[in-house]
Amino acid sequence: AVGGGSGAFGQVAQGFAERILHPSRLQDRELLRLLADMASCVGGEGFVRQQQAAMGRADTRNWLPGLHAPALVVCGREDQVTPLTLSQEMASLLPDAELVVVDEAGHMSILEQPDTVVAAVLRWLERVDAVRL
């Protein structure tokens, strides 16, 4: 189980893991242990504050067309928190963006498919560096 302890917070953390991870990763003990450690560091009160801050955050998509810098948008194909359609929208609004969709990943794509994400970031950095030279 995932969670920063037992009881209600442990149950919430477990349910959250089911929402942020690709179904194929729900039995990955190492990944679940990492999420449990992350949850433990934040604690129940911190977790609630994080969620409130995220839900209360202003919609800043209207700013994206004005950002004139290279951008890489990475999204897990099965991300339930930031669905692929939102990542596609974000990438389309940014003037110089590339979208990378990570298969067999949810919201935690960097933890679920680290080799794929790191390779994509390195390829993107090489392209950005080549353009600037």
Regions found by a protein language model. Name each.
Residues 4, 39, 79-82, 106-109:
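Glycosyltransferase donor-binding loop in the core domain
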Residues 16, 51, 90, 117, ...:
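Hydrophobic "lid"/C-terminal helical patch
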Residues 63, 70-72, 95-98:
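Structural signature of beta-strand start/N-cap positions in the alpha/beta core
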Residues 66-67, 73-75, 79:
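Short beta-strand/loop motif that positions the catalytic acidic residue
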Residues 95-133:
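Catalytic active-site module of serine/aspartate enzymes centered on a nucleophile-bearing elbow/loop
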Residues 7-66:
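Conserved alpha/beta-hydrolase catalytic His-Asp/Glu region
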Residues 60, 69, 83-92:
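Short alpha-helix in the alpha/beta-hydrolase fold that links the catalytic acid
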